[in-house]
Amino acid sequence: MTSFTVIGHTACTDASFPLDDLPGKGGRMDLLCRAVASSLFLSHGIREDTTCDIMLLGQPHPGRIIRFDGSALRSLSPDERNIASSIKRALAIPAGKTFREAGPGLLTRKGTLADQLSEKHYAVLDESGVDIRKVATEELPDAFLLSDNRNFSDDEMELIRDIPKYSLGPAIVHADHAIVLILNEIDRRRSGWI
């Protein structure tokens, strides 16, 4: 199972955010929706071996995590509006420290980056990291951490200081594009192309 966690530094944590203003009042929720779509959707299906957790750190209740689990998802389309509607549904239910189901394959809880990092062996995508193509397949982690359009904060940098860092190439790309590149690399290796 491949997992992605994407931090949304300003993503709204109130279910009343408007679907017609995801970048503004949604707190760049559009970026998180694209990351979810890139993580889970194939041309004619869903990656059942992938999860995407989005960490919503915006107001009014920072520290909400929403998980999209490809093995159980139903009725999700790859467009931003549909994914944002699922996020709203997850935000509408009370959340505690353990995941609670908001729908098939849609889970939510309260949590921090430290909580996330304690659950899996992560790698961070960083342009100054080791070229991912130089990393042996068996050394690739099962989980990848990405940030939205903002750099990791100083506190986040301290938490990820000792985590392996990988680069996807010489150009800096958007988080959703980075997810596609990682999955393509994994697909190529699993299929014996590399």
From Swiss-Prot:
User: What reaction gets catalysed by this protein?
Assistant: pseudouridine(54) in tRNA + S-adenosyl-L-methionine = N(1)-methylpseudouridine(54) in tRNA + S-adenosyl-L-homocysteine + H(+)
CDD domains assigned: TrmY-like
The biological processes this protein is annotated with in GO are: tRNA methylation
GO cellular component terms, A-Z: cytoplasm
Keywords in alphabetical order: Cytoplasm, Methyltransferase, S-adenosyl-L-methionine, Transferase, tRNA processing
Q: What is its EC number?
A: 2.1.1.257
* Annotated positions binding S-adenosyl-L-methionine: 125
Q: What is its main location?
A: cytoplasm
What Pfam families does this protein map onto?
A: Methyltrn_RNA_2 (PF04013)
Cited InterPro entries: Alpha/beta_knot_MTases (IPR029028), TrmY (IPR007158), tRNA_m1G_MTases_N (IPR029026)
Task: Decide whether keyword Methyltransferase is in the record.
Answer: yes
One GO MF term, please?
Answer: S-adenosylmethionine-dependent methyltransferase activity
Q: Where in the cell is it found?
A: Cytoplasm
Q: What does the subunit comment say? A: Homodimer.
- Which family, according to the similarity comment? Belongs to the methyltransferase superfamily. TrmY family.
| UniProt function note | Specifically catalyzes the N1-methylation of pseudouridine at position 54 (Psi54) in tRNAs.
Name the HAMAP family for this protein: tRNA_methyltr_TrmY
Q: Which NCBIfam families match?
A: PRK02135.1 (NF002560)
This chain's protein is named: tRNA (pseudouridine(54)-N(1))-methyltransferase
